[in-house]
């Protein structure tokens, strides 16, 4: 045992030394990292917000199986796994997960059914980098960004005419395998990238043993294609799909022989098609004009099962959900250089989420005491927004940033049907209306948000 311990300590010290040596040789200068957190390409130190970047090199060197595991070591970021290896949501600076805006290439992953926040439905093998904005960014990104923003930038070609890579990885936490393959390149103005991956992981290993019902699988594929018509104009498209099968459980219930809890998500799938066109340096003032449009579908099937003792009875709640969200979005952004000291970003955004959700809930308290509730809702939320953000350079290394965003939201619940059948203590239900399904109707509201900040960059390599 002593020899074993000595060997481990020696090996750990050697690995630490090697790691430090490699870090010293491969240090990435922060000033060289380019980000788009401010909706325009900037050096990281020039961004007037608290931004952390997970680079492509860090992603490649990581053993992370999903985006949540890539973000869990960032200060100020907390990853909520909801009892599962494969289901991750992000909280920033203590805010709830639904106050974190999750974007893929600047476009929102919508979650309209729960208040748990959007799950990050993309594989790390498709990602070029991740930009995390810590703190409110409502003028540039809307009110969903009250806690912060996770913007995932996908891979888009390479500098060489052709590159290909593949990987096979094994993870001991769940005895799982992950395989990925990708190829891409640039040739005479044509930029392309293709990738695909598959992961399968068993129940997670913990100090208490293997936790049952925590296995997951996921698969993904994406394709990107763009063409540079000249030095000023580029257009392209991207299509991707991500599908997962996720299970979740709880040690608290597993250790109680009279209770049972599990969540099964046999299907959580995201499909997306996006188009863009961009012009750069169009005249003396207009430095960039970009249009984006996209369609996205988010489909989740879920079963939530809870069994608990209640006196001499056992209460069982078994719920099934089928949620479909279709999202249509478009945006137009113009960047202006107004003299040497003023840079203005203006834009318009449109997003419409269309939700359809079916829920079947069964509650059993005894053989003759059970109820079945069916609910169906259909609705949509339409958001229009205009925004403007100015950066003004002042003397003595000061920069003034100020902006405004005005948002119009139109929410409509067009169908809300709920019926209940069965027996409860002293009551019989026969297609009885369910008063918890909600009421058909619509609501409109609009409001502005503002920002004002003064930044000083007088110290080198700080922001």
Language model features with spans:
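N-terminal Sec signal peptide and the immediately downstream disordered periplasmic leader
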Residues: 1-64, 68-74, 184, 219, ...
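Non-catalytic regulatory/gating segments with a bias toward low-complexity or hydrophobic composition
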Residues: 51, 59, 71, 130-132, ...
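Extracytoplasmic beta-strand/coil segments of soluble accessory domains associated
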Residues: 68, 72-108, 128
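Short acidic/polar hinge/loop motifs at secondary-structure boundaries
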Residues: 107-134
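Transmembrane beta-barrel wall of Gram-negative outer-membrane proteins
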Residues: 170-200, 210-249, 265-280, 338-344, ...
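Flexible loop and strand-edge segments within Gram-negative outer membrane beta-barrel domains
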Residues: 207, 232-287, 297-324, 373, ...
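Structural signature of Gram-negative outer-membrane beta-barrels, strongest in the C-terminal barrel
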Residues: 230, 341-343, 349, 377-463
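Solvent-exposed loop segments that connect transmembrane elements
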Residues: 249-263, 303-320, 358-375, 411-442
